[in-house]
Amino acid sequence: WYIASIYITLSLLVLELIRLSQRIKPWFPKWMKGHWQQTKLTLFFLIVFGVTGLMIHAYHTVMNPIVKNVYITLPKAAGDRDSLTIVMMSDLHIGEVIGKDLVQKYVALSNAQHPDMVVLAGDIMDYESRFAENAHIEDDLKQLKAPLGVYIVYGNHEYRANRNAKYRWLQKTGGTLLIDSVVQPDSTFYLIGRDDFIHKKRKSLHSLMEGVDTGKPII
């Protein structure tokens, strides 16, 4: 409902701007001015049906996740490794809508790819941590299978509400938190995880690169 209210408010704002422009410099066609009440009613239902359709589509998309394959060729050699399969998931927004069942579906999809490594790229939680805590969703994320590990970086939602509780909960998921830090999942490449831009004092990429062997692939 929060998202729907935003779209409805924006639509009404646009309509109000159109109405004001008509008062400044009339440009509505005669048929519209002659049937203004019917026009307003039509526009109202268009907004309601449009936002409803958009929300239904968004809900269907969230409830039926798909895997998108992206192939990237790196110019640097990674030892004897000729390929690396990474599952990247972002914006899970675990909360009132995204709960245990859907997270289990995400985990199953990830494991079906047989990845070498999994990266959770921010906004793991929507707002408060209590929904994930009460449902023990950390136990589901522990089921992510990847021989090189599971890595987690912050998004802006990790800084909302009870950020310390979120930090403690993320540590229970079995993943490695990368907050302005660098790791080597194995000896052939580096993985750099930056803090979210909302943290104004986050380290620069240049400082994180200090001590990194630039002859190896860096992700």
Please place each PLM-identified region on the residue numbering.
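Solvent-exposed, charged interface segments at domain starts and junctions
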Residues: W1-E16, V103-M117
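Non-catalytic terminal accessory segments
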Residues: Y2-M63
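Extended recognition/assembly regions associated with phosphoester-bond processing machinery
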Residues: L15, R19-Q22, I56-A58, V70-T73, ...
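Alpha-helical transmembrane signal-anchor/signal-peptide segments
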Residues: T61-A77
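Soluble catalytic domains of enzymes that build or remodel membrane lipids, polysaccharides, and related
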Residues: T73-I219
